[in-house]
């Protein structure tokens, strides 16, 4: 902040991880709708377990947070035949899908089959998804968090998953990281836990460096910079 106050132009690498994070979200959804954890368990037990699966096509997904990551999640989910509804504090009009304001979160929860959190952590969003929002989701709905763990009431999430109200969850972020060994999230059969690594790929630094080089060229040409803080 001090550099900005002194007139120094500061930029970020925002968007450099949008593609791999969105792909991770789709991985969660494909795995959960097909009960991949259950199939892997059956494979380990050498048990032939045929079952019907749920299709993504036709499901409605709510994407809370429409920055570069949220927009890419909306784009990929639409490619799978899903209906994305975005959500952000202020609708700008350039979003890739229908987008609602954040004050309609409870209504969004009642509307969607899948709720994805992709919103930054702030004083306003801390604890945003509490027991009432989780309870408003349809029975069997799926929940994904690739934002920050503190955006959701983790105890309420465990209750919603343990009771069977939620059909499953894909979680890359947690209130405490690393996730404590005694957390029930480790052993719930309808939960996929990943270690806050959805945006970490072999190309992560390459994409960030591409943004830096583009901004360097823009600076020399006197053009507006990308991701200006």
Task: Name each region found by the language model.
Residues 10-11, 140-142, 146-229:
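Rossmann-like dinucleotide-binding domain for NAD(H)/NADP(H)
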Residues 74, 78, 161-162:
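Gly/Ala-rich phosphate-binding loop of Rossmann-like dinucleotide-binding domains
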Residues 28-52, 203-207, 211-214, 218-223:
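A charged, well-structured terminal subsegment
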Residues 90-184:
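Rossmann-like adenosine-cofactor binding region
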Residues 1-40:
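Phosphate/diphosphate ligand-binding glycine-rich loop within oxidoreductases
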Residues 39-72, 98-103:
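Glycine-rich NAD(P)-binding loop of Rossmann-like domains
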Residues 53-57, 78, 135-136, 185:
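Short, flexible hinge/linker loops that cap or flank conserved catalytic cores
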Residues 82-83:
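Residues at the starts of beta-strands that form the adenosine-phosphate
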């Amino acid at each position: 902040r001090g550099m900005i106050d002194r007139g120094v132009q500061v930029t970020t690498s925002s968007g450099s991880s949008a593609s791999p994070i969105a792909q991770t979200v789709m991985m969660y959804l494909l795995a959960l709708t097909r009960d991949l954890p259950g199939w892997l368990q059956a494979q380990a037990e050498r048990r032939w377990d045929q079952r019907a699966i749920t299709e993504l096509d036709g499901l409605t997904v709510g994407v809370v947070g429409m920055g570069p990551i949220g927009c890419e999640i909306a784009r990929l989910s639409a490619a799978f035949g899903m209906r994305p509804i975005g959500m952000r504090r202020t609708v700008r009009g350039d979003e890739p899908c229908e987008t609602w304001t954040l004050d309609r979160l409870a209504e969004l929860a009642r509307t969607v089959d899948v709720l994805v959190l992709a919103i930054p952590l702030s004083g306003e969003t801390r604890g945003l998804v509490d027991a009432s929002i989780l309870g408003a989701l349809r029975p069997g709905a799926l929940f994904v968090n690739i934002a920050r763990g503190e955006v959701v009431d983790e105890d309420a999430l465990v209750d919603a998953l343990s009771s069977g109200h939620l059909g499953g969850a894909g979680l890359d972020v947690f209130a405490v990281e690393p996730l404590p060994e005694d957390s029930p999230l480790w052993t719930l059969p309808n939960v996929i836990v990943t270690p806050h690594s959805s945006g970490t790929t072999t190309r992560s630094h390459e994409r960030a460096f591409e943004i830096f080089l583009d901004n360097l060229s823009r600076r020399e040409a006197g053009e507006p910079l990308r991701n200006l803080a």
